[in-house]
Amino acid sequence: VIFGNHFYRTDERYPYFGSDTRSAEMLDLYAESAIRGMETGLYAYLAHPDLFMRSYGRFDGHCARISREICRRASRLHMPLEYNVSMIAYNEAHGVAGVPHPDFWRIAADEGCTAIVGIDAHDHRVLESGLYYDRAVRELAALGIPVIDTIPFFEY
């Protein structure tokens, strides 16, 4: 099972992290729920761990702090983080650094994280081209982040 940290606890009471993370409080909620989810042991990896950057605007000190918390915990739990390439075309077309966010991934490298490259299936064209996948592998290698290419399964 893949952990997509989209909402704090429930979508019925809390806003979507990808479009509504505009305050330090929302960043803290994101980090708290990401860490709690990883600690359950139910998930193979954390999808788009930098999702909050779709709406936060700029990578400030608070982003760096929560990113370090998330990455440190993922590393200690041996949980891969997904380097999600689905938004790269959008980022480039609009001149933004959203997901994947370079500053987040520098922290992930510093914390000794492992990555898996992911491609959301929202647009079939992303799946049909290896362009973004190959680029992601090169970028992660340049950061010194090990990349896995299979989803780890639970061993009971």
Where are these regions (language model features)?
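Extended substrate/RNA-proximal surfaces in nucleic-acid metabolism proteins
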Residues: 1-77
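Charged catalytic cores and adjacent phosphate/nucleic-acid-binding surfaces used
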Residues: 58-156
